[in-house]
Amino acid sequence: MSEALKDNPEQEMICVDAFGGRTGRIIDRKTAHSTPGIKHLAIQVMVFNPQKELILHERPLKKVGGGVWDSPTTHVLNGETPSQAGVRCLKDEYGIASNEEEITVLGGFSYEKDYGDGSCENEFCLAAFAVYTGSIKPNGEHVIKLMNFPAKKVRDEIKAGSSKYPVWFVETTRIVAADFNGKKFFE
């Protein structure tokens, strides 16, 4: 069993169907991420600066799906709205104090990934983005290294088949780049 499944076992996840519709069921994090998993709600917030750069972090290997470049990602917990979850996640992972109005939540996507160690992903993930100009104080529990990457370069690497980004990041990039307000960062 993956050690990552011991992280935040008390989290109460919102179960959803393949289209993000709530089923009314609440489940603990360990059960949600133990193979084959139970579909639950998540959100990823891409953070851009005004120079059209994505602020990304290297995800620790000890985390489920670790060892890749990623944006802040979390579960929408029981009693939270997606925007509230995004605010919580930005504070927890990057030390960014934001409010719900600063996060643009777009559509979502359903995906599954089995890591072969008893842990998996089985989520409907909402794509979101925010623009940030202040200082970032990364949380070492979530961040090995923090770097700014030109957003266009990241999208080009994804199109070329790069494996340094997780599947949920690839899908979030697709959704944000297709959005009227999000696409300007990738031009």
Task: Enumerate the predicted regions with their spans.
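A glycine-rich, hydrophobic loop/mini-helix early in the fold
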Residues: 40-75
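Nudix hydrolase/Nudix homology domain
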Residues: 64-68, 78, 109-113, 119-187
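Residue-level structural signal for beta-strand termini and adjacent loop
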Residues: 28-29, 60, 142
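A structural signal for short, well-ordered beta-strand segments
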Residues: 45, 72, 105, 126-130
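Short hydrophobic alpha-helix segments
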Residues: 26-27, 58, 109
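Acidic, metal-coordinating catalytic segment for phosphate/diphosphate chemistry
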Residues: 2-44, 48-50
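The catalytic Nudix box helix
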Residues: 56, 71-106
